[in-house]
Regions:
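ATP-grasp fold ATP-binding core
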Residues: 1-5
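Helix-start/capping segments and mature chain N-termini
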Residues: 6, 11-201
């Protein structure tokens, strides 16, 4: 289910007060559960991160993400990997980005620079259970391109391995063993919490 709540509707104005009646909108969308076998690795394309500064607030103002994902699509990639003006990687267009180097899991720390995704939180819990060292630090694109493995997560895609970023293969370009293990554990946890989802994709 996808839920959206707005302050309400009034005559066009940039000002607001406490007299609005909130508008609540929700819809459901049927999704097939992920198959056990890891999917083929996807490609990412780097794009400038042009979003506003409060990315931790989940809003419907997604123009920056739409433009990034469209640019990635036109470049033949599955998803965008957004780069801040200082050269650091922030996150993917509509997913959280992780990479593995020397069996350490890297992910950008929680701040106003990224969306605090629920799937991201769950993946960190799974990684802790696997006794992986977690590095919640900022990092550059050069660090990412030298990674052993990489993957993206979101509620709609679960865990997808990343095999290439721009023209650079990540690791050997295949599904890394740590990624496969984390994905399997994540799906097991999801099935335990949602046991009545029989279909696979």
């Amino acid at each position: 289910m996808y839920l959206q709540v707005t302050r309400g509707s009034r005559d066009r104005s940039y000002l607001y007060d406490d007299q609005y009646e909130p508008t609540v909108f929700a819809f459901t969308q049927k999704e097939k559960f992920a198959a056990d076998a890891p999917p083929q690795p996807v490609a990412l394309a780097t794009t400038p991160d042009i979003r506003w500064a409060r990315r931790d607030i989940k809003t419907t103002n997604l123009l920056g993400q739409v433009m990034a994902k469209q640019a990635a699509h036109l470049a033949g990639a599955y998803e965008a990997l957004m780069i801040a003006p200082d050269g650091d990687v922030t996150e993917a267009g509509s997913s959280s980005f992780f990479f593995i180097k020397d069996r350490e899991l890297w992910v950008r720390p929680v701040s106003n620079d990224i969306l605090h995704g629920i799937t991201r939180q769950t993946m960190l819990r799974v990684a802790e259970q696997h006794q992986l060292k977690i590095r919640e630090e900022t990092y550059t694109l050069d660090q990412v391109l030298a990674a052993d493995e990489a993957f993206i997560t979101a509620a709609s895609i679960y865990v997808l391995p990343v095999g290439r970023i721009d023209d650079t293969e990540i690791g050997d370009g295949g599904v890394g063993p740590v990624t496969a293990s984390l994905r399997s554990a994540y799906l097991e946890l999801a099935r335990a919490e949602f046991p009545k989802v029989p279909e696979t994709a």
